Amino acid sequence: MRIGIFTDTYRPQVNGVVSSITTLERELRKKGHKVYIITTTDPDAPAVEPNVLRIPSMEFKPLPQYRLGLLYSSRIIKKIKKLNLDIIHSQTEWGVGTFARFAAINLEIPLVHTYHTLYEYYTHYITRGHFTVPAKKLAAAISRFYCEKCDALIVPTRKVEDILYSYDVDKVMNIIPTGLDLDRFYRKNYTEEEIKFMRESFGIEENEFLCVYIGRIAQEKSIDVLIDMFSKIKDKTFKFMIVGRGPITEDLKKQAEDLGIADRVIFAGEVPHDKVPVYYQMGDVFLNASISETQGLTFVEAMAAETPVNARYDLNLEDLLVKNEAGLVYRNEEEFVNNIMLLKKDKEFRNNIVKNAFNVSQDYTAEKFGERVEAVYKKTIEEYDINESFTIFRGEKYIQQIRRWTSIKSSGRSPWSK
């Protein structure tokens, strides 16, 4: 197959969506498919990128790490047409996602969409605390509109499926969790001496119990909740390491100082991608309090690393942790603390959790991810009916309007530049 993946975010950016796309791209190419990436321009992108087509874009001010691409460019459409795509796979509901829909209509190509992000948990970046309820309703409306107008819909977890149904999305959904390169997280890759050396480099003694959080340092991750609950553990042999970077780092440092635990909370900062696995190995337990995750890939990484997970209860953890006794969940401060104490005191219990978690993680391999998405592509192409697809896009009149609009040539690139 000749596959076009449309996304607002791609390398050199680093985030969960980019990781998912990179993994999918590689697995599809292993299977002999031709994969093209259609994404936004980026000032840090390489000058030459085989099979990558970049759409003029500009910085999105509320979230500077993201870029907003043109909704349409006749020049880019002509280039896409020459690719002779069999399927278009959009990874966003916004700029490039809209472009993907226009391309699917104009070029009569089936459209598959993956819904990655629960926007209702991120509206604070735009509203700054104002109009929160209307913003969440708008996010739901946009999600519903886009998801219903594709030929096939992929979601990563049952939680996302349930939320989209609550948005009144009337569409059959394919639940396909993102796959990961798990090999690099396995404990067998690291010696006890290497792990001990890394712990000592941060002042962690052999008898100390290290809790770790790895991820973006942002409001929706609820790291402040973790720090507050961790402060209830008065035993000074317990320490908490926060790995990552983000806009609220300084606020969290102040919180730790105010709680009198600054000497037990370690801010490791951002670490190179290839060094992340050893930080899981350093930890005695992986902590998380976020309920904004669509699937929680860091949970799977910790499970593959044989580091037990203690996470705030959320629906997406039912299949991942609860059902298979592959990790611990808490609903309040008391359960949070009790879980940590249990993992420290009961070695047999901890070993059973770790064993179950490792086995569950094997269902999240990159290879299985590629196979599942490939199957959706094949089914969508087989069942594709151009007339029915046009109906999905709200009828012939709507199609004619889009085609008239998209026949207008792009008037220029500024400020949509690299």
Predicted regions and their residues:
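N-terminal subdomain of nucleotide-sugar transferases
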Residues: M1-P56, E374, K378, E396-K418
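Short hydrophobic beta-strand element within catalytic cores of glycosyltransferases
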Residues: P308-A311
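Donor nucleotide-sugar binding/catalytic pocket of nucleotide-sugar-dependent glycosyltransferases
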Residues: T39, L53-P56, V133, A139-E194
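Conserved acidic donor-binding segment of nucleotide-sugar-dependent glycosyltransferases
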Residues: K323-E334, L342-E348
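Nucleotide-activated donor-binding/catalytic signature segment of Leloir-type glycosyltransferases, i.e.
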Residues: D251-V271
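Aromatic "clamp/platform" in nucleotide-sugar-dependent glycosyltransferases that forms part
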Residues: I291
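A conserved mid-protein helix/loop that constitutes part of the nucleotide-sugar donor-binding site
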Residues: S19, F209-K232, F240, P247-K253
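Short alpha-helical donor nucleotide-sugar binding micro-motif in glycosyltransferases
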Residues: C147, E270-V271, V278-G283
